[in-house]
UniProtKB/Swiss-Prot annotation:
Name of this protein: Probable ATP-dependent RNA helicase kurz
Organismal lineage: Eukaryota, Metazoa, Ecdysozoa, Arthropoda, Hexapoda
UniProt similarity note: Belongs to the DEAD box helicase family. DEAH subfamily.
GN (gene name): kz
Phosphothreonine sites (modified residues): T530
Single Gene Ontology BP annotation: maturation of SSU-rRNA from tricistronic rRNA transcript (SSU-rRNA, 5.8S rRNA, LSU-rRNA)
PROSITE patterns in the record: DEAH_ATP_HELICASE, HELICASE_ATP_BIND_1, HELICASE_CTER
Length: 1192
């Protein structure tokens, strides 16, 4: 019991329960208790008390002592709890499994695993042989017994037969094992064996033996065939019928195809394409995906009824791939064709069509569902061009629409270094992630070599590295990556001078001292790619002849052979020994190639070998602006004894595969054109490439054998400064042309379009503002501000031209004053970049214009008057016209060389001119425009109109000269001599040094392009494509950017009867900077004052001629409507309010109101007249003359 606690009873704190049953029986009259506070009575303060003592009961709470469990009991209870939890989990699991179990009807259609052969396959022949022997022995025994059927069989003899039966039963049990099923067993065999078992007892009936008790072997229950349920009719699915279209290739082509990695994946690729509407194929360059995948689809029958479309981001790739595929398939070009911006060979018989992505986008505008195609292949998707991103977004919606209509369209996205996450993880683009196929490239291992330090002068470093490779490493082509055309030409010129190539005719020269004409032409052709100046070309020719004569003298001097001791020389080793000596391992080679010094830049100590002993280099340039003929030279065979060396921009990164390349020198940079999202200012900046691009460049060295890639930057720079992928073009460039095309296609909410990488919101807003300024979009004049701007009629016209929207507006406004031929030439020239060859230093403003040898001739093309004020576009106009005439005479190359024009650019200008001419003739019925080679220059008046048309298209690119009079500092005035303030820029911009208006420096100009250049540690802004304008034109052609401060009443506003509008003189400013504009006349903007002035002209009879007869009966003059005291006259006030309420400020608005309400203004006008009844005016109302136009 334990020790009793002191005062334990008091410590218990029991609960006393009082029996209140007697109190509850007492009846209380509540109303009789006057003023009683019933709420205040409780158990402690009762209202009444019973007469007798209440019974109480003490309740003591019993304290329950918790019994402590032992460890064994706790484990036992825990096991019970765990068992219960497992049972609960098992029930939940069984319930979940039952929920996803297939129906019983469907389950019966499957084959049980017990009916599938799984084990015992090797023992089947042995068992069959053993069973046959047993059956033979049994047959012999039965035959003997049948012959002596009258004899009684003793137990011993019967026991032998019993043993045989038992052995056979045991063997049959093994054969009937549900895990072992003979592949030859069928229903007939099983039924026959059952019959034999039934006949056996009948035959042994006379034999007096006890019937053996045997266990029947387990038999497989063969279920009768179940009729499959007919599936319910589903919507038309994409069921591809197996088709094979034979292709007769040559043996050589077939053998070459078999070496491509994608040929091994053909089965998997085609099965994936057949089963999925959208497929992504990722494979390194050289895997053969571009050339082989269209052939797979052709052989699978996708080109039987529709075409296979393949898009390429570059025109060169589209043409080259088309010809290559046609050659491999042994098909004519009429069936495997291409279509690019200016040319194509597509015919009605075309089955495979290669095109640029812009061409396919234009086809979607006319045929949204692409009903001509069965497959669309988007190649080079990793380059992420603007058109490719739009096509991916559009096709992601077109493919499901075609599937619903029962005309499935396959979409295949191909790329070398694909940003797979942009496609597979973008649920807004693809609701169901498309399958990804990775094709391994036919790639040899490439050893990557980094620099210890990253040099600043990467061109000089590339030159030194090339010398090391050429002098010390084995045979193999060299591919050098630099940033731009200037660096390509500089490096090509330097390498050609260091390792010159002497043609075969040099032997004849050594004999007779003469140079053949063929050698001269070939030498000139080699020098033309790098030396643009004819004087330099002539100097190079003379230098070549001089070197040949020197080599002749050296040859004669060496004819007297000296005595040579062969013991002083060591026999040369083979290539393998040279490889081992020069390339013991990666570290040694890196160290040997990196220990360069600046002395190697000198041409005397470059190689340490005589000019006659050095192996020549066949150095070729490659960049996008190079002519197609010179680009194709990289595919031609290299002359004997030469090593191929290609100096290229990033064109050779993915678009073209250059043969015989073993060494790659990667500078790690690229020239990127950056755009300001708000102002549109562009800047060419040399930046690091992405890691994906660097890997692409390195992969070029592993096409023919194991190669090496020498990266002219450190590994730390590669890890820290290189992005994984380049930023898509759609996020870097202005997108107004993209927005206008999409809006004309019916895509109003461009923000919600499923871009793989959507453009920035700032880009879209800036593009929308520019299109509104151009008049292509119009803000809705409703209270609902959420509606996007609507496309105007002008916007639809602009979208039909394959040029930028600003140039499209210029074409749309040129249908007057015979300006269309000149505008077409201007637009074609302005749309092609770098038409003019610029020489000399262009960044220094102190360089005189005469430093450019073409400047004087261009100054004569824009000599004076409006020709000069038209400025640089006038130079382009004269150049295009003269080049067209020279081309008709067959003298285009000579003309371009003599006048500083790029021949390739002039060819593109002519193609675009022809295309624009055809578009205009197609869309405008009353125009017969042609490309006239004898087009005369425009007149002075036409040149003035062309200035206005240029302003209409480039109204957001207006610049005003910096006022030098306000600058006191002479140095600052000298620095800002050619400086202009642009509308959206804070820093001043300078006129381009080659502009013909640089000396004149007009006060107001428009420019075609603003760009930024690095000038030392700072940057400097330049503008080019300059045209002078008059400031009063801004109010007329760019009204949305003008700010009207005040409407002038002197001179008084006037009403133009032709247009039905009011014109007035205003004080205005231009742009955000508030540049003052001279006094100009414009249409009076909508305001209460404009409505009052319109009412004055209406009462005066100028708006409607029928009301002129009532002018004498007016109670007050028409001018009283615009007076301030007119509000005191109720009748005049009602007339004014009626016009202001309906916003009637021109004749067309009044006519529209009368069309909806014919009695508008009838009562108000009648109140302003003397002695004119309402019945007299009603027949005349509305007072619109039938000859007056209903729509302006």
């Amino acid at each position: 019991m334990g020790k009793k606690v002191h005062n334990a009873k008091a410590r218990q704190n029991p609960q006393t329960i009082v029996d209140n049953s007697a109190v509850k029986k007492i009846q209380i009259d509540v109303d009789a208790v006057a003023g009683g506070n019933q709420v205040g009575y409780d158990e402690a303060n009762a209202l009444v008390l019973p007469s007798e003592k209440r019974a109480t009961k003490i309740k003591v709470d019993k304290v329950q002592h918790v019994k402590i469990l032992s460890k064994k009991q706790r484990k036992h209870l825990q096991a019970i709890v765990d068992k219960k939890k497992k049972k609960e989990g098992r029930a939940q699991l069984l319930g979940d499994l039952a929920a996803v179990q297939i129906p019983e009807e469907e389950l019966q259609q499957y084959t049980s695993i017990s009916q599938v052969q799984t084990v015992g396959l090797k023992r089947l022949p042995t068992l069959d042989e053993y069973l046959a022997k047993k059956k033979e022995r049994q047959a012999q025994v039965l035959a003997e017994k049948s012959s002596a059927s009258g004899l009684r069989v003793n137990a011993i003899k019967g026991s032998k037969r019993k043993l045989l039966v038992e052995e056979e039963e045991e063997l049959q049990a093994k054969r009937k094992n549900p895990n072992v099923i003979s592949v030859e067993e069928d229903d007939e065999d099983s039924s026959s064996s059952d019959e034999d078992d039934e006949e056996a007892p009948a035959q042994s009936a006379p034999i007096a033996i006890p019937t053996p008790v045997s266990i029947a072997p387990p038999q497989i229950a063969v279920k009768p065939p179940i009729k499959k349920l007919k599936p319910e009719p589903n919507p038309p699915a994409c069921i591809h019928q197996t088709v094979y279209v034979p292709v007769h290739r040559t043996t050589e082509v077939q053998n070459a195809r078999l070496r491509l990695p994608i040929l091994a994946e053909e089965q998997q690729v085609m099965e994936t394409i057949n089963e999925n509407p959208i497929v992504i194929v990722a494979g390194e360059t050289g895997s053969g995906k571009t050339t082989q995948l269209p052939q797979f689809l052709y052989e699978a029958g996708y080109a039987q009824h529709k075409m296979i479309g393949v898009t390429e981001p570059r025109r060169v790739a589209a043409i080259a791939m088309s010809k290559r595929v046609a050659h491999e398939m042994n098909l004519p070009e009429s069936e495997v064709s291409y279509l690019i911006r200016f040319e194509g060979n597509v015919t009605p018989a075309t089955r495979i069509k290669f095109m640029t992505d812009g061409v396919l986008l234009k086809e979607i505008e006319t045929d949204f569902l692409l009903s001509k195609y069965s497959v669309i292949i988007l190649d080079e998707a990793h380059e992420r061009s603007v058109y490719t991103d739009i096509l991916v977004g559009l096709l992601s919606r077109i493919v499901p629409l075609r599937h619903k209509r029962g005309q499935p369209l396959k979409l295949i996205i191909m790329s070398a270094t694909l940003r797979v996450s942009d496609f597979t993880e973008n649920t807004r683009l693809f609701k169901i992630p498309p399958p990804l196929l990775k094709v391994e490239a036919r790639q040899f291992p490439v050893t990557i070599h980094f620099q210890k330090r990253t040099p600043d002068d990467y061109v000089a470093e590339a030159y030194r590295k090339t010398l090391k490779i050429h002098n010390k490493l084995p045979e193999g082509g060299i591919l050098i990556f630099v940033t731009g055309q200037q660096e390509v030409n500089q490096l090509v010129r330097k390498l050609r001078r260091t390792f010159p190539y002497h043609h075969a005719p040099t032997k004849d020269v050594a004999k007779n001292g003469k140079v053949s004409e063929e050698e001269k032409e070939e030498t000139i052709d080699d020098a033309a790619s790098t030396v643009e100046d004819p004087k330099e070309l002539e100097f190079d020719m003379k230098r070549v002849i001089r070197n040949i004569r020197k080599s002749k003298k050296k040859f004669l001097a060496q004819m007297a052979l000296p005595k040579i001791n062969l013991d002083d020389y060591k026999l040369p080793g083979d290539d393998t020994e040279a490889d081992m000596h020069e390339q013991p391992d990666e570290d040694d080679e890196q160290e040997g190639l990196e220990e360069d010094n600046d002395d190697e830049l000198g041409l005397e100590d470059e190689s340490g070998m005589g000019s006659g002993q050095r192996q020549p280099l066949w150095v070729l340039p490659l960049y996008s602006l190079l002519s197609s003929e010179k680009q194709n030279r990289i595919f031609l065979p290299v002359p004997d004894g030469c090593r191929l060396c290609v100096v290229s921009t990033n064109v050779a990164e993915t678009s073209l595969t250059i043969p015989h390349i073993k060494y790659v020198v990667d500078c790690g940079r690229q020239k990127t054109r950056l755009y300001d999202k708000l102002t549109g200012v562009s800047a060419f900046v040399v930046t690091y490439t992405s890691k994906a691009s660097a890997d692409q460049r390195a992969g070029r060295a592993g096409r023919i054998s194991a190669g090496h890639c020498y990266r002219l930057y450190s590994s730390a720079v590669y890890n820290d400064c290189f992005e994984d992928f380049s930023q898509p073009d759609i996020q870097k460039k202005p997108v107004e042309d993209l927005m206008l095309q999409m809006r004309c296609m019916g895509i109003d909410r461009v923000v919600h379009f499923p871009f793989p990488s959507p453009p920035d919101q700032v880009q879209l807003q800036a593009a929308e503002r520019r299109l509104i300024v151009l008049g292509a979009l119009e803000v809705a004049k409703t209270e609902n501000t959420d509606l996007p701007p609507a496309v105007t009629r002008l916007g639809h016209v602009i979208s039909r031209f394959p040029v930028a929207p600003r140039f499209g507006k210029m074409l749309a406004l040129s249908h007057q004053q015979n300006l269309l031929p000149y505008t077409v030439c201007l637009v074609a020239a302005l749309s092609v970049q770098e038409v003019l060859i610029e020489t000399g230093v262009q960044r220094d403003e102190d360089v005189a214009p005469g430093a450019n040898r073409f400047h004087r001739k261009r100054q004569s093309w824009a000599a004076s008057g409006n020709y000069q004020l038209l400025g640089d576009p006038m130079v382009l106009l004269r150049a295009v016209g003269a080049a067209e005439y020279a081309g008709s005479q067959g003298r285009l190359p000579e003309f371009c060389a003599a006048n500083g024009l790029r021949q390739k650019a002039m060819s593109e200008v002519r193609k675009l001119r022809v295309q624009l001419t055809n578009e205009i003739n197609l869309n405008v019925s009353d125009v017969e425009l042609g490309v006239d080679p004898e087009l005369k220059p425009p007149t002075d008046a036409q040149a003035r109109f062309l200035r206005q048309i240029l302003l209409a298209g480039m109204g957001d690119r207006v610049a005003r000269k910096v006022p030098l009079a306000d600058i006191a500092d002479k140095e600052e005035r000298r620095r800002l001599k050619y400086a202009y303030n642009c509308a959206d820029m804070e820093e001043p911009a300078f006129l381009h040094v080659s502009s013909v208006l640089r000396q004149k420096a007009p006060e107001w100009v428009i420019y075609q392009e603003a760009y930024e250049l690095q000038n030392g540690d700072s940057t400097k802004m330049f503008i080019r494509g300059i045209t002078a304008i008059e400031p009063e034109w801004l109010l007329l052609y760019v009204p949305l950017l003008c700010n009207i401060r005040e409407v002038r009443e002197d001179p008084a506003p006037r009403f133009d009867k032709t247009s039905g509008k009011i014109f007035c003189h205003v004080d205005a400013t231009f742009g955000k900077s508030g540049w003052e504009l001279p006094l100009g006349e414009v249409e009076m903007p909508l305001s209460e004052k404009a409505c009052c002035y319109f009412g004055m002209f209406l009462l005066d009879g100028e708006v409607c001629s029928r009301l002129a007869d009532f002018r004498s009966k007016l109670k007050s003059t028409p001018a009283s409507v615009i007076k301030s005291w007119s509000s005191m006259n109720n009748k005049v006030l009602r007339f004014k309010r009626a016009l202001i309420t309906k916003q009637i400020h021109n004749r067309q608005a009044l006519i529209d109101q009368w069309n909806s309400d014919p009695h508008f203004l009838l009562e108000e006008y009648q109140n302003l007249l003397y002695d004119v009844a309402l019945s007299e005016l009603t027949p005349l109302w509305p007072p619109v003359d039938k000859k007056e136009p209903q729509r302006q």
